């Protein structure tokens, strides 16, 4: 055994051995209980960052721990490889997105291997590979057959300068991120997945996800947004048109004095009178440049325009003006709102602004509301007035009665509405999965026959940054023979939203080389659900919801038996670091600040707050440099020790150095005692300091096991091992009890193995074991060793600590009380005082009350 801890040499040695032995390969036919551990796979940006290190270190602890416990662990890794960054890089660096992506994958794979993560690399997938996306295309075709995929018109972000559709994240301050042109809403034909067919099941099944954080479940429930109410038909005056309105407040129907429609409503232009046309068109053009999220925020300026048309309130025949309003969206309800200004604050403000009449229809029992003097809407419960036969009813009771009345009259119906909208999956992008559809002038929309899959993404394209998808200009790809009639036809040039790839990758990992379909039914049913999924909470209502939807769809397509993809979910916190800046050079990298000065100009650097590590603010740490300086085990240890997994981690160099010193200390403890403990065993009976050390060893085993298993309290688990190492260094009876010292050192190595596997494998071998740590398994604690002969009791006088005493663990309260009254340093606080009461808390403390 070398005297000094050489992190680089040790880590290289064990990583090579693990790869040669395929140590982490999951076995298909295995009697052991399965455990599927998965972290959200990364986009291959080119380099891993400290967020990756933390996320994957958390997962690796669990995977290694479960493997040591005897589970057959599946722990795969792959690449969410399609997406816009590759196209942007292609434009910037004049390279092909595929070349850029695969080079990045190679680089990041090497980085992950340097971290020593226990991945089964035989199961690696890249979603940009045809052998992955061919099966995604097949799933789409099956969904099309079932009516779960369809095409319709939808509004998208459109840059008129670039002549292309922009994703939401490409819209910055209402403008195109590339050219600065104001973005508008444009109606295009898009493909959709009918996730709304599963809205109720997705909502109901959140109750089954007891292993998920409640905030994630709450976000999903709110996103699905189930509400019960009425759909009401409002006839348009002097026409045959009807406007459908969804409301949860049918109790206020008699108070509707105007209607608000989304600017994108399909009837918007049909409702416009000649005299209002110019103003309405200008309004619609303006609204289409406004961010949808901002339009509904409370502080956004509410605007509207009168269409020149009137609706008819179906319960009282009142003519009410129809407005277009910027705060109404097509994304909720029907895109049309019956506006009751006296009982909705937004409608109240709008009515005051545009001088629209108001009618009170709900008021408190002891008060009469007057619209002329009201300063805000009345939104509390009350009694109906001005509501014909329903006057006098409390408004909650009136909801049911008015709903029944609407159904009787044939002008409305009780219904359930969801905030959730069908998932638009079309992207006018090149670097994505081609949608397997052919357009034929004679046959219309024709699915690509299954035997012709995959529809390959052509690689001989030039990414120029010009408007539109390059696929639309690629004649060999575009022109095709119709499989139905044999005539000339063209391919769909849209590609799938990249969230489609990540909605089923966890299933493909179970059988990544299966060639007869997306998944092998028996294999996927064995491995799913994922026992532990780990990733960021920012994916709560996109990826995590879509993955649940896809699982249910694949179940209904007969591809798997499971209802849910992920049994347990851990959402880890961010990695944060102080920012630093210079008046001359702006944001600075950490290495550009030395002794508080900018190394570029010598100016005093300004230190900012701790923020999420980001390239833009340069508060980043390069994992490669960290590994080079300290080793992968130190990087892993700090990322696990500095904060609980679900909390944000604040980076500091001193903490990293402390973890590095700790590993040196563990190494030294084994090195210094190796010769003495060689070949010895724990004696049958021990006492004194040896018994205390054994007790701490087994208490630590018990604590670390509980902290890892299910709770993920890695920081406290590591802290308890650090305390054990301190006890090892303080064990003065090691020459008398070398077997106890050996047990303590071996326990330390085994307990640290999931956290810092390289150094622990090396130390385990140094301790004379040939089988490796996995062969040894996870240590079990001995309950007998935990039994205490003595306890240390704190003694207080009038609530202040005045001494401690050591007493037999089984001493009764009288014995403890008498010993406390005679304890050193306690007696002097009792002199001249009267003892009024003695309170004994068994096993912990004695409080003597005197006066």
UniProtKB/Swiss-Prot annotation:
A motif ('KMSKS' region) lies at residues 612-616. Its main location: cytoplasm. One of its GO terms (molecular function) is leucine-tRNA ligase activity. Gene3D superfamilies: HUPs (3.40.50.620), Isoleucyl-tRNA Synthetase, Domain 1 (1.10.730.10). CDD domains: Anticodon_Ia_Leu_BEm, LeuRS_core. Its EC number is 6.1.1.4. ATP binds at residue 615. It comes from the Bacteria. It is an enzyme of class 6 (ligase). Keywords: Aminoacyl-tRNA synthetase, ATP-binding, Cytoplasm, Ligase, Nucleotide-binding, Protein biosynthesis. GO terms for biological process: leucyl-tRNA aminoacylation. GO terms for cellular component: cytosol. Pfam families: Anticodon_1, tRNA-synt_1, tRNA-synt_1_2, tRNA-synt_1g. PANTHER family: LEUCINE--TRNA LIGASE, MITOCHONDRIAL (PTHR43740:SF2), LEUCYL-TRNA SYNTHETASE (PTHR43740). This is Leucine--tRNA ligase. It comes from Syntrophotalea carbinolica (strain DSM 2380 / NBRC 103641 / GraBd1). The gene is leuS.
